[in-house]
């Protein structure tokens, strides 16, 4: 008697690749669907952390999620077919490290910085990215160690460059070529969990820049850029005031030996003398809002008032029976009312009137228009100065502008101080931060409506991609409050200046400099010799630098996702990697779903919304549910053309020795 071996390949060994591996092991342990299984894991970076979360990156770079709300493992809240298998969250793992004896610390192999961070990390602290990478690497080892006895894992520290059916067009066994010359043949399933992939290098913003000796750095992860050649005192312009900006800010200051000290009203910066002279700006002219201090514990979240399961079912049913929805007409009014209700309810509670909250919400939601809702506000004693204003929240600067740089600087420092005060009050207690946290809490509900073409293509392009996604990021996924404090201290120390709203950048050929100005801040424009695009590159399959995705697109084995649009026959081509609904099979140029290829995560942005969000315990994490769906589909496959092996007798689950995890070199 002989049996077949199932051979699987996961391309990408970051958090999503790890989640698929963990879920696949869980399915196989519960019920060994195949007598023998090999899982190849392909990534040039160390498995678990991958490139983005690598452990060697500077310790100045922080996550923007608290430690207790980060995990690799499933729980009872996750809607999935597979078994729940417990494992530590990031904070729970930190507690494990903190409890180690000195001998255990030596045996564990973790460096002093990791152990020190573990001892200091609280449930609501923001970990360094390097520490998260250490967690991911350790969880990868645990998953492999806990794998069922019939499953082996082989790690290939290389880059996948091409994928093909061994028999063209058959949908059978797959062959994957790696950059080191290795060819993985006879693959029964391939899962693409590529994460953030590099984009093609764009040219300089103006052909004059290179000729004038100006340095322009395109959008990228700051940890991937070598900026060591920028000399102290060099004027540097950062275009963007989001999370990427704060990374650059930290690397140019803390990363160059500067330090902050606490004083009664904020921080003071102590320069090292190695900093460049920093200038920054953006369209809004203010940084992302600070995250409110977490008061929701591990899994607390806003319970939807309007975006209920019944309303979501009604909206998705309308889409399936007809054209895509309009975001502005159908979803935005619901989101806006949810946020406003939480703001006003928290405002009443902060005034000692919590008992009136339910009555207010009922009356406010019953209001048919702005006039009706205004009457409700008057009845509950909420005056004009305390009323929620979306325009002011999205663009907080004065409409009339400023008298000059000094006036703008004073206004900005007060804006930053107010943001810190609100953040310190918490994401439940402070009316503004509680309201903005609703946007984060509603992401799953919004995804259920907009994913897989739920919106009309033009509404997806103009309203979701072109407006709401940016607004959502600005208001709800900002940095810790400590970063806003640091920014203010750098402004006060003369290390950083913010140009102002409506940033405009040009080149002065006579002066060989980038020139930046704000139309709302009169005065002498800023001049810089270095321009850094302080943002990540846009996810776009058509402009990716990833060799595997480029090859799949060139050969017609994948395609860019296109959303039908009522007023545009050609629809909206998004640049996202097209996949089916769960379990996310890859779709080729002719619209055919491949039975043995799966993809999820960042490259599928636009098919799915906000794909960069991580897995959180206790809230039915979409990421964990997606990983389980893919793992279940892979485990259900029949081997295509794997070599035959002797019949296998399962000795039961055991903890495999180190030789079960094999690192393969060419």
Swiss-Prot record:
E.C. number = 1.14.13.248
Question: Which co-factors does it depend on?
Answer: FAD
Q: Where is the composition biased (Basic and acidic residues)?
A: 656-666
- What residue intervals traverse the membrane? none
Q: In its UniProt entry, what is this protein called?
A: L-aspartate N-monooxygenase (nitrosuccinate-forming)
Gene Ontology BP annotations: antibiotic biosynthetic process
Which reaction equations make up its catalytic activity?
L-aspartate + 3 NADPH + 3 O2 + 2 H(+) = 2-nitrobutanedioate + 3 NADP(+) + 4 H2O
Q: Where is this region: Disordered?
A: 645-666
Q: What are this entry's molecular-function GO terms? A: monooxygenase activity
The pathway where this protein functions is: Antibiotic biosynthesis
Short name of any one Pfam family annotated for the protein:
NAD_binding_9
State the family named in the UniProt similarity comment for this chain.
Belongs to the nitrosuccinic acid synthase family.
Which superkingdom? Bacteria
The record's annotation in SUPFAM superfamilies points to: FAD/NAD(P)-binding domain
Q: Which UniProt keywords apply?
A: Antibiotic biosynthesis, Monooxygenase, NADP, Oxidoreductase
> What is this protein's function?
Part of a gene cluster involved in the biosynthesis of cremeomycin, a light-sensitive o-diazoquinone with antibacterial and antiproliferative effects. Catalyzes the iterative oxidation of L-aspartic acid to nitrosuccinic acid (2-nitrobutanedioate) via N-hydroxyaspartic acid and nitrososuccinic acid.
